[in-house]
Amino acid sequence: MKSIRRGDGLNVVPFIDIMLVLLAIVLSISTFIAQGKIKVSLPNAKNAEKSQPNDQKVVVISVDEHDNIFVDDKPMNLEALSAVVKQTDPKTLIDLKSDKSSRFETFISIMDILKEHNHENFSISTQAQ
């Protein structure tokens, strides 16, 4: 009698390799998406510290090179920004990201709004040199 030879089966190692590469691509793309859509060239600082991620809610106020103001990637004017800050809990961290080409006057206007509403929990983002 002849014995029936079983097939070697399907080799899944190349499939696993492809899945790991795709996973790495998805993870790297998701970190770029999480950084925000507004392109802001931050000023440099020698003593810049990395912020420690935590579970605290953060409101991001960005100013682009054309002095446009964005709150969490939504365009706003100073009056609308004042209303948002007024509604924001004083314990909520506000992260200020101002483009190095923007006017300092816009930055000062935002600081005045924060002071007007007694919001002292904020950080100013810079880029380490």
From Swiss-Prot:
Q: How does it sit in the membrane?
A: Single-pass type II membrane protein
Q: Name one GO cellular component term.
A: plasma membrane
**Keyword Amino-acid biosynthesis part of the UniProt annotation:** no
What is the name attached to this protein's record?
A: Biopolymer transport protein ExbD
Q: Which InterPro entries match?
A: ExbD, TonB_ExbD_2
Q: What does this protein do?
A: Involved in the TonB-dependent energy-dependent transport of various receptor-bound substrates.
Q: Where do the TM regions start and end?
A: 13-33
